[in-house]
């Protein structure tokens, strides 16, 4: 990355200071071509462990490895120049101890060029967040529905629907802010919970199925673009149907190949005459 590119990229400080005056625009990205398209429009690009399901067809995020995250994180950094790039720490790469988390995060930052890491967990991860931030690792925390804990909570269900769950999420949010997280993702909660957390914190709260009151929003880009099949979460708004368009393009290509219409003369190289 050139010095000019580095200077133009949004920093974690800029994201932290976005609390209040506007909305943080965040999307997922897993590849350089997609990052290139999203970069002019997004404040933050998240290389999420959702890539396990979106890119690799895994049934959950649990099979994603640190090496996978690093490879895709580096690709997104290479494909972008403006957005702040944040990379998820995958399941099993940070839960054992704060030192394990630091070693994983250090690899991510050093090998990708990303600006920060994201990790799931509430009060129980506050010590780890504090350990990381004290050692120069910027952290985005993630609470509410936490996909890495899907087996513990019994599936992908909205969180904070009861009073005790609402209070737990608020305690998680406050503990993570105190630990030094510069932003917080709140996923799939009751709307009132997302609103309450946003109002209670001084750091930006980025919602995904949380509340329009959040300081920003994030979606899985392939869901937003209509590339994820028929079923998408209720909180997703689809702004295109690129899956259908890709299918139609592939159909036209197949028809041309089978009919001998492609490649046409304009797609072929002629033999050059000797001078």
UniProtKB/Swiss-Prot annotation:
The active site is at residue 187. Its EC number is 2.1.2.11. 3-methyl-2-oxobutanoate binds at residues 49-50, 88, 118. CDD domains: KPHMT-like (cd06557). One of its GO terms (molecular function) is magnesium ion binding. InterPro entries: Pantoate_hydroxy_MeTrfase (IPR003700), Pyrv/PenolPyrv_kinase-like_dom (IPR015813), Pyrv_kinase-like_dom_sf (IPR040442). The keyword Transferase applies. Mg(2+) binds at residues 49, 88, 120. It is found in: Cytoplasm. GO terms for cellular component: cytoplasm. Its main location: cytoplasm. Keywords: Cytoplasm, Magnesium, Metal-binding, Pantothenate biosynthesis, Transferase. Transmembrane segments: none annotated. Its cofactor is Mg(2+). Binds 1 Mg(2+) ion per subunit. GO terms for biological process: pantothenate biosynthetic process. It catalyses: 3-methyl-2-oxobutanoate + (6R)-5,10-methylene-5,6,7,8-tetrahydrofolate + H2O = 2-dehydropantoate + (6S)-5,6,7,8-tetrahydrofolate. Pathway: Cofactor biosynthesis; (R)-pantothenate biosynthesis; (R)-pantoate from 3-methyl-2-oxobutanoate: step 1/2. Homodecamer; pentamer of dimers. Catalyzes the reversible reaction in which hydroxymethyl group from 5,10-methylenetetrahydrofolate is transferred onto alpha-ketoisovalerate to form ketopantoate. HAMAP family: PanB (MF_00156). Belongs to the PanB family. This is 3-methyl-2-oxobutanoate hydroxymethyltransferase. It comes from Bordetella petrii (strain ATCC BAA-461 / DSM 12804 / CCUG 43448).
């Amino acid at each position: 990355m050139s010095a000019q590119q580095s200077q133009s990229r949004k920093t974690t400080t800029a994201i932290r200071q976005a609390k209040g005056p506007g909305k943080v625009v965040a999307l997922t990205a897993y590849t350089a071509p997609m990052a290139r398209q999203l970069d002019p429009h997004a404040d933050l690009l998240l290389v999420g462990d959702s890539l396990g399901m979106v890119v690799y067809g895994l049934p959950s995020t649990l099979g994603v490895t640190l090496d996978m995250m690093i490879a895709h994180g580096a690709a997104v950094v290479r494909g972008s120049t403006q957005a702040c790039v944040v990379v998820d720490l995958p399941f099993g790469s940070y839960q054992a101890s704060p030192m394990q988390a630091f070693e994983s995060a250090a690899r991510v930052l050093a090998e990708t060029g990303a600006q920060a890491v994201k990790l799931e967990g509430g009060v129980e991860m506050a010590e780890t967040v504090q350990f990381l931030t004290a050692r120069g690792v910027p952290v985005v925390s993630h609470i509410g529905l936490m996909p890495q804990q899907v087996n513990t909570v019994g599936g992908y269900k909205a969180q904070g629907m009861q009073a005790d769950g609402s209070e737990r999420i608020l305690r998680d949010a406050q503990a993570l802010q105190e630990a030094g997280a510069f932003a917080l993702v709140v996923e799939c909660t009751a709307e009132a919970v997302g609103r309450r957390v946003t109002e209670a914190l001084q750091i930006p709260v980025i919602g995904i199925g949380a509340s329009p009151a959040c300081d920003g929003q994030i979606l899985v880009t392939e869901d937003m673009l209509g590339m994820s099949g028929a079923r998408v979460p209720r909180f997703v708004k689809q702004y295109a149907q690129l899956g259908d368009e890709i299918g139609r393009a592939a159909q036209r290509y197949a028809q041309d190949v089978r009919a001998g219409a492609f490649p046409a003369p304009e797609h072929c190289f002629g033999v050059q005459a000797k001078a």
